[in-house]
Amino acid sequence: MSGNTLGTLFTVTTFGESHGPAIGCVIDGCPPGMALTEADVQLELDRRKPGTSRHVTQRQEPDQVEILSGVFEGVTTGAPIALLIRNTDQRSKDYGNIAETFRPGHADYTYWQKYGVRDYRGGGRSSARLTAPVVGAGAIAKKWLRERFGVEVRGYMSALGEIEIPFVDWSHVRENPFFAPNADIVPQLEGYMDALRKDGDSIGARIDVVASGVPVGWGEPLFDRLDADIAHAMMGINAVKGVEIGAGFASVAQRGSVHGDELTPDGFVGNHAGGVLGGISTGQDITVSIAIKPTSSIRTPRRSITRAGEPAVVETFGRHDPCVGIRATPIAESMLALVLIDHALRHRAQCGDVSSATPRIAARAPDAQ
C-alpha cells in the first residue's frame, strides 16, 4: 500500500490500524535545534482524542504519545522523529457482523476490490483513528512555524448540518467541545446532536482554518502551488468531500471588480484569494474551508451486499462519532501546518537569499472591507 507519506522536505509517514496494537508516524526533515517534549505534542492530541463529550465516540483512548527518536536532551536533532500512540480500547467484537459485508459509504468495498483483503475492525487503515499521528506531527509543525515566523494556525466549526455558526471570537473556540466560535449557539448544537443520536443517524459539518502571519513567497508553481498542496492535504482527511480557499465556490457569482483584491501602498483591500495568488502566499491570512460528510457508520439499517455479491442489510453497532466534524478542527489545523512548514523549508532552500526592491505591503489596508 503506497500513498502513506505527505510532504517533500518535511515529510510525515503514518502507520498502523484502528484496532492494531499502535498507530504512529515518522517525521523526516524537521529542523534541528528546536526544543521539543512529549508534552508539546500531547497538548494537541488531547484536543482531538475520543471520548471527550457525549457528542463523540465513546471509545476511551488516552492517545498518550511517545517520542522514540529524533530528540536528544529535549531538542530536535534533525534525525527522523518517530511518534507512537498505543491503542488501548479496541472492541473488535463490535465488527463481527460486517466481516462478510460492506458498509455503505465506507472504504470497505473499495479496499476489498483493490487489495483483495481488508481489516474490517473499525475500518483498519481507513479509520479516522489514523488522524491522531497527523495531529501529533502537526503539533511539531505548529511549534516551529510559531517560533520561527510567528505563524499561528487556528480553526473552528462554522456549520453543523444546516446550523450556521456565526463567528464571534476565537476565545469561544476552546471553551466548548464543538470548537464553535460562538458560545451562545452551543446549547442548540447539543440539542441537535442529542436528537440525531436518538435517531441513529449522523450529520456533516464545515470547518474553517486560518493561518495568520505567513510571509509572502511560500509556494512552488505550477504543480506544487501552495493552495494545491493545501487542498491535497485536506482531502487526505477522512470524510472530507470539499475544500475551498478564500471565497471558494462563491467566486462563481462574484464579478472581477469585486473578487480581485486591490493593492494599495497601505495594504490589500480584500482577501477573496484566501492569501494565495498564483500558488504563492501573499502575506495575508490563508483561509481554508472544508466540507465533512456525515459519518457512514450509523445504526439505521442500510442495504448492501456480501463479499459473494448477495444482498444484505447492514446495521453498525460500533462506537462512532455521529458527526466526525466535531473533532476535525485540530486535524484540519495540523494538515495546514504540515503544508506550511514544508513550503517554508522549500522556499528557504531555493529562494532564501532573494530580495526585492518593491516594499512588502500590509496584509490588510486600513480601509479594507
UniProtKB/Swiss-Prot annotation:
Enzyme class: lyase
Catalytic activity: 5-O-(1-carboxyvinyl)-3-phosphoshikimate = chorismate + phosphate
Entry-linked Pfam families: Chorismate_synt
Transmembrane domains' residue ranges: none
Keyword Amino-acid biosynthesis: yes
Family the entry assigns: Belongs to the chorismate synthase family.
Subunit record text: Homotetramer.
HAMAP family: Chorismate_synth
Protein name, entry field: Chorismate synthase
